[in-house]
Amino acid sequence: MRVIRAVATLHAGRAAAVRQGVRSVSLGACRAAVETPSLRSAGSQFESRRLFSRSSYLRNANMTAAEIALKQAKELAASNMTPEAAAARMTPEEAKRLARVRNIGIAAHIDSGKTTVTERILFYTGRVKAIHEVRGRDGVGAKMDSMELERERGITIQSAATFADWKKKEKGVEETYHINLIDTPGHIDFTIEVERAMRVLDGAVMVLCAVSGVQSQTITVDRQMKRYNVPRISFVNKMDRMGANPWKAVEQINTKLKIPAAAIQVPIGSEKELEGVVDLIDMKCIRNDGQRGVNLKISKEIPAEIKELCEQKRQELIEKLADVDDEIAEMFLEEQTPTPEQIKAAIRRATIACKFTPVLMGSAIADKGVQPMLDAVCDYLPNPNDTDNTALDRSKGEQPVKLVPYNSLPFVGLAFKLEENPYGQLTYMRVYQGSLKKGAYLYNSRGNKKVRIPRIVRMHSNEMEDVNEIGAGEICAVFGVDCASGDTFTDGGLPYSLSSMYVPDAVMSLSIKPKRSSDADAFSKAMNRFMREDPTFRLHVDEESEETIISGMGELHLEIYVERLRREYKVECETGQPRVSYRETITQKAEFDYLLKRQSGGPGDYARVVGWIEPNPNGGEDNHFESRVVGGTIPDKYISACQKGFQEACIKGPLLGHKVIGSSMVITDGATHVTDSSDYAFNLAAQMAFGKAFTAAGGQVLEPLMKTTISAPAEFQGNILMLMNKRGTIVDTEVGADEFTMVADCSLNAMFGFSTHLRAATQGKGEFSMEFSHYAPAPPHLQKELVQKYQKELEAKRTK
């Protein structure tokens, strides 16, 4: 034991000395350090943490005492390090590695060319040897669309991860940047894929169509980026299309998305004559040459016809930067012209601060402008050390703690996506702090369950590359970890948890059952998998009809899962008519005085509750409960039962059996019985009181309104106007040279089968997208119809 105490002393002194910057220290010096009042706490901290136990001493018996002490000192020093100290102690090699890492996503409105852009990125970085297009026209399909359904429909359904190395020339020297990339869906029905990608990414490329500019899903993606403070660069794609207008896109980013933006490029040529771009920072021409535009021809000679435009747009760029960056503002006021290096530095600062987005241009399908966009990813988007990632320290009342992407610090990671694989559950993980090694043990902060990591892989769409270790700031996937999406993992030494991603409510449901009873097990297995992988896909069994009900973000969302059941599990299903997820609420105050009194031989049920229900006085959709009971007429132990009863009553409203929102219950008085009162009685009394008072409180059905955006050739404007007048309220109309866009708030109930009507009205040339907007009172005739239908269903079940 004397040896252990001596080594403990050495360890504590060494740890104290390390914190003071001493690199080499003797045993005597360590003892002296521990004895000094200012450093004595290191020894006590060592004792309290019990980092150096007899068992660890025996495990390290082949090491000298000094070596053990040095090892333990490093561990203690690392665990105690502040974020600032960790950053200061980062080795040059580690700092250089992080500076060359980019975790980015590609996000946009549907059909803006995200997957095509990603395919070019993979080709130019050497990750794929040949380019394949979406929809599988060449029999192969884009690399990132690995699902058969994605290739058939030409849409991205699941986000796909990959990684690539981009060689960028900096001051004549070639630097290699490591890019972790996630390609996300553009359809609103798969918005959770974008949501969880944005939760773990450091930056993003927002792709816009040069013809359509900012579209409905662009606005949704912008909102998601802002929710997680994700800096972005913007890429105006499809510059080779007829009617391409990049300046309209730049203007709409400023006005519709409310984020300062300026072009850093000007296109050379237009539409089919697109040749390349002019870099406004260095004032040079960049043209793609050779097969698939692999070679770049760089020239200082700007075509005469666009020279004046380039000078004008460069000045606009500097003026816009002066609005968002202090250094450029100072130079602008002093009428100084910033150098290209100063402009680049300002763009980087403002972009990382989410104050600005630089706009680049090109056409992925025409192999133009993608390489300069990759350079911009490296120049302007943050590395993992540039972003403020925080965890919540549960031991300190969930106080925010900054995480530092330093390999020597204790591990902290977030599981952000789950995927079923032939080899088991694949868990996608973002490593925020520390490093992860194959065979390591981690702790799930939800339940503190210990898990072993048997296999670590880097993903390349549906392909995997095994690795033994992954560093801080990286994205990887692991096998053999039983967890839920959004779980936090640590090495056990930190009581940290990471905030999860936002999950929107489902807006549509339908009943489903397998056609063959023999498929019940496969059906159940598939449903469990889908719910685990997708938080927006939900399932419940209706208590009255005993039907299995699935809920999701829209018709396409549920249709895809029904199709996946058939293809992946060979389960043919019968589905009912889609159902709208209505809500119920109250519009006025109504008092209640309800007495529950039942006797059945033994102890009975007795509970009296008095009070009122009213719309939530604070507004919003939350339900609120309050007790104003005085004099102990209802003991405190029964008040919580009343609250629980109110909450249970709100799960299934009296009008349609849908959720109740925006209501408040206040209990002011009541009565109890010596033997017959119980939690159960007061729970039931609160439920019954709420139900009885609901009608008097002006119970109302709320229906979901969808923000619907329709785009079509201008010649069909009249036809679409007639369609939309029957379904909702037109909010905005924008007419372009060849096409127009209409935005309307439509009742979801009126939108079933709309795609068929739109095809007929536009000869198949129109397209539309929907996203949930808000709940609004249903028209009186619809409410009456829905309530009568619900009452008939209840009556039919009672008579069975």
UniProtKB/Swiss-Prot annotation:
GTP binds at residues 108-115, 183-187, 237-240. CDD domains: EF-G, EFG_III, EFG_mtEFG1_IV, mtEFG1_C, mtEFG1_II_like. Pathway: Protein biosynthesis; polypeptide chain elongation. InterPro entries: EFG_II (IPR041095), EFG_III (IPR009022), EFG_III/V (IPR035647), EFG_IV (IPR047872), EFG_V (IPR035649), EFG_V-like (IPR000640), EFTu-like_2 (IPR004161), G_TR_CS (IPR031157). GO terms for cellular component: mitochondrion. Residues 99-385 form the tr-type G domain. SMART domains: EFG_C, EFG_IV. GO terms for molecular function: GTP binding; GTPase activity; translation elongation factor activity. Gene3D superfamilies: 3.30.230.10, 3.30.70.240, Elongation Factor G (Translational Gtpase), domain 3, P-loop containing nucleotide triphosphate hydrolases, Translation factors. Keywords: Elongation factor, GTP-binding, Mitochondrion, Nucleotide-binding, Protein biosynthesis, Transit peptide. GO terms for biological process: mitochondrial translational elongation. Residues 1-59 form a transit peptide. It is found in: Mitochondrion. It comes from the Eukaryota. Mitochondrial GTPase that catalyzes the GTP-dependent ribosomal translocation step during translation elongation. During this step, the ribosome changes from the pre-translocational (PRE) to the post-translocational (POST) state as the newly formed A-site-bound peptidyl-tRNA and P-site-bound deacylated tRNA move to the P and E sites, respectively. Catalyzes the coordinated movement of the two tRNA molecules, the mRNA and conformational changes in the ribosome. Belongs to the TRAFAC class translation factor GTPase superfamily. Classic translation factor GTPase family. EF-G/EF-2 subfamily. This is Elongation factor G, mitochondrial.
